[in-house]
C-alpha cells in the first residue's frame, strides 16, 4: 500500500470529525418534541430550525472551502470543530425561537465546513486503489454519530434536555486530536499575486476553466442522493406503522437496524468502488436502494419488513462515502476541498425539500406512492452519473 505515512492518523482524525456532523443533525431531531413545548412554537417554526441549519451548511461550504484552500485543510477542520462546539454549547444560554434560528444557522456554517476538507485530506494521503474504502469508512461515522445521539438522548433527555446539545462540545477537544494526527498543509498563499506560495483560490474557482458543467452536474448528483435519502429515511418508519401495521414498540429498534445496514453499506460500496470504479459502484448503490425501497411497496409481512431495513440502509448510504473519493478526484487538487464541500452541501437542498414533498404526495396519493417517487429519484441519479467522467476505473485484483 502506498500513500503517505500519515494515512492512518488522517483516517481516524477525519472519522471522528465527521461523526459530529450527524450528531448535530440527529440531536436537533431528537430534541424537537421538547423544543416545541419549551419555545412554544408550531411545527412549521420547528421545521425552520432544521432549514436554518441546512442553509448555514450551504454557506459554510463556501466559507470553509475557501479557508481550507487558502489557509490549510487542517486549519479549516480545527476551526469548524471549535465553531461547532461553541454553537452546541450556546444552546444552554438561549431561550427564544429567534435566538435558536440564528444559532442554528451559525452552527450549520460549521457543519458545512467539515465534509470537503475531510474528503480532500483522504485524497491527499490515500492512494487511488484504496481511496474509495478509506473515504467510505470516514463518512460511515455518519451512522455512528446518529447512534451516539440516540443513546445520549435516552440518557439525558428526561433529565436536562440541553445536555443533549452540550455533549456536542466534545468537538472542541476533538479539534486537538486533529492537530495531533493531521500533518500541516503544504504552504498555501493568502496573497492575490501568488508570490508567497500558491495563488489565492477565489469564490469562482469551481466554475472556471471548464469546471462549471462538472460542478453543476456533481451538485445535482448530491441533490438527488440527499433527496432520495431523506425522502425514504424520513417516511419509511411512518409508512411501516400506518400502512403495514408494525407497532410502535416494534419500530423502537428500527433506526438501529437501518443504521447497522448503513454502516455496512458504506464499507461494501467503498471497497466496490476500488474494485470496479467509482461511477459503477455508485450506480450499483442507487439501483440497490431503489430496489430495496420497492420491496416495501409490494411486500406486507411485518417481521420481514422490519429486518429488511438492514438492506434499505445498506443501499441508502452506499454512494455517500464513494462521493467523498469521487469529488476529490473529479476536481483539481488546489480546489478539491472547496469543490467537494460545495457540491455535497448544496445538495442539502434535496434534503430540505424531500421530506415535505414526499409527505405531500403521501397525503394526496398515499405514502406507498411517495416512496415509489424516491425509487424514481434514485434511478434518475444513476442516469445522471453517466453524464460525469469516471475518475478511477478500479483494480479488480485489489
Features from the language model and the residues they span:
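Helix-breaking motifs and short loop linkers at transmembrane-helix boundaries and internal kinks
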Residues: 40, 72, 93-99, 127, ...
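Glycine-rich segments within core transmembrane alpha-helices of 12-TM secondary carriers
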Residues: 131-154, 344-354
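Extracytoplasmic gate region of multi-pass secondary transporters
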Residues: 29, 211-266
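Cytoplasmic helix-loop-helix junction between adjacent transmembrane helices
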Residues: 103-140
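Interfacial helix-cap and linker-helix signal at transmembrane-aqueous boundaries
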Residues: 35-36, 67-68, 152-158, 240-241, ...
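C-terminal membrane-cytosol helix-exit motif in multi-pass small-molecule transporters
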Residues: 170-188, 382-389
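Conserved MFS/SLC helix-loop-helix module at the cytosolic interface between two early adjacent transmembrane helices
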Residues: 59-95, 276
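Helix-loop-helix hairpin linking two adjacent transmembrane segments in secondary transporters
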Residues: 138-180
Amino acid at each position: 500500500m502506498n500513500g503517505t505515512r500519515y494515512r492512518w492518523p488522517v483516517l481516524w482524525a477525519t472519522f471522528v470529525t465527521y461523526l459530529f456532523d450527524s450528531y448535530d443533525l440527529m440531536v436537533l431531531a431528537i430534541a424537537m418534541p421538547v423544543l416545541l413545548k419549551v419555545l412554544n412554537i408550531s411545527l412549521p417554526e420547528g421545521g425552520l430550525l432544521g432549514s436554518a441549519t441546512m442553509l448555514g451548511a450551504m454557506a459554510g461550504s463556501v466559507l470553509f472551502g475557501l479557508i481550507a484552500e487558502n489557509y490549510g485543510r487542517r486549519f479549516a477542520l480545527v476551526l469548524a470543530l471549535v465553531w461547532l462546539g461553541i454553537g452546541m454549547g450556546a444552546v444552554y444560554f438561549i431561550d427564544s425561537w429567534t435566538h435558536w434560528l440564528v444559532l442554528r444557522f451559525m452552527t450549520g456554517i460549521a457543519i458545512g465546513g467539515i465534509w470537503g476538507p475531510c474528503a480532500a485530506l483522504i485524497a491527499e494521503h490515500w492512494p487511488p486503489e484504496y481511496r474509495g474504502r478509506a473515504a467510505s469508512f470516514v463518512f460511515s461515522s455518519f451512522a455512528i454519530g446518529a447512534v451516539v445521539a440516540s443513546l445520549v438522548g435516552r440518557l439525558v433527555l428526561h433529565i436536562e434536555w440541553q445536555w443533549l446539545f452540550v455533549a456536542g462540545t466534545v468537538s472542541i477537544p476533538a479539534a486537538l486530536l486533529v492537530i495531533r494526527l493531521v500533518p500541516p498543509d503544504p504552504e498555501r498563499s493568502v496573497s492575490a499575486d501568488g508570490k508567497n506560495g500558491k495563488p489565492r483560490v477565489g469564490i469562482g474557482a469551481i466554475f472556471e476553466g471548464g469546471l462549471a458543467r462538472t460542478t453543476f452536474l456533481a451538485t445535482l448528483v448530491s441533490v438527488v442522493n440527499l433527496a432520495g435519502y431523506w425522502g425514504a429515511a424520513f417516511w419509511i418508519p411512518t409508512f411501516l406503522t400506518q400502512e403495514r401495521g408494525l407497532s410502535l414498540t416494534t419500530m423502537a429498534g428500527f433506526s438501529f437496524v437501518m443504521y447497522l445496514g448503513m454502516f455496512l453499506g458504506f464499507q461494501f460500496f467503498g471497497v466496490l468502488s476500488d474494485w470496479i470504479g467509482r461511477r459503477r459502484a455508485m450506480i450499483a448503490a442507487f439501483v440497490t436502494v431503489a430496489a430495496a425501497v420497492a420491496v416495501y411497496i409490494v411486500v406486507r409481512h411485518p417481521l420481514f419488513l422490519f429486518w429488511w431495513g438492514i438492506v434499505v440502509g445498506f443501499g441508502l448510504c452506499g454512494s455517500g462515502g464513494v462521493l467523498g473519493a469521487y469529488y476529490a478526484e473529479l476536481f483539481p487538487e488546489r480546489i478539491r476541498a472547496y469543490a467537494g464541500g460545495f457540491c455535497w452541501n448544496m445538495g442539502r437542498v434535496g434534503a430540505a425539500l424531500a421530506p415535505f414533498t414526499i409527505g405531500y404526495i403521501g397525503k394526496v396519493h398515499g405514502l406507498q406512492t411517495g416512496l415509489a417517487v424516491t425509487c424514481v429519484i434514485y434511478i434518475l441519479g444513476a442516469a445522471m452519473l453517466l453524464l460525469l467522467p469516471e475518475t478511477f476505473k478500479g483494480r479488480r485484483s485489489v
